[in-house]
Curated annotation (Swiss-Prot):
One GO BP annotation of this record: viral process
Role summary: Plays a role for multiplication of the virus in different cell types.
Membership in a protein family: Belongs to the poxviridae C7 protein family.
Entries under Pfam families matching the protein: Pox_C7_F8A
Protein name: Probable host range protein 2
Amino acid sequence: MGITHELDIFVTNEDLALKNIELFKGNSYGCFINLKVKEEKRFNMIFVLRPDWSEIDSVKPIRMTVNNNHVDVEKVSESIHEVVYSASFLISFNSLVKVFSDDPDKYKNVYPTVTINVPKKKFKVVDQGNTYMFIQYPIDDCDKERFLKDEFKYCDNEYDQYNDCDE
């Protein structure tokens, strides 16, 4: 059958989700993100990896570069269902972000490529690679509540009893 992990990336300060960035099959995950900016900007990203444990004992860590410079990716939490990572970086010109578990140059034909034009608020999947990836804007409320509680304050306590995001 083959391994099929699930990976979502949340670009929190743009309220944008890159969903289903996993390969159709295989023990590798990653993507290329072209960021277009007009001025200095900080980006905060949350990575949610849902491993397929059927044929592996541990997950490969997520690594990241911006314009070929290493960016620290911190593991925030880990459970049997998912591993959550975060990263933050600052850019002042158009940049290429590589998110990967394995050598990105080896997988450049299968990892997806996305362009995020921040000033114009335009987002595009340039190449899906071997994935079913899509862009979600804005990030849906269930994902915000599960993974981004500290990033977004969007819910009044009065309405918490009606929250349908709980599993």
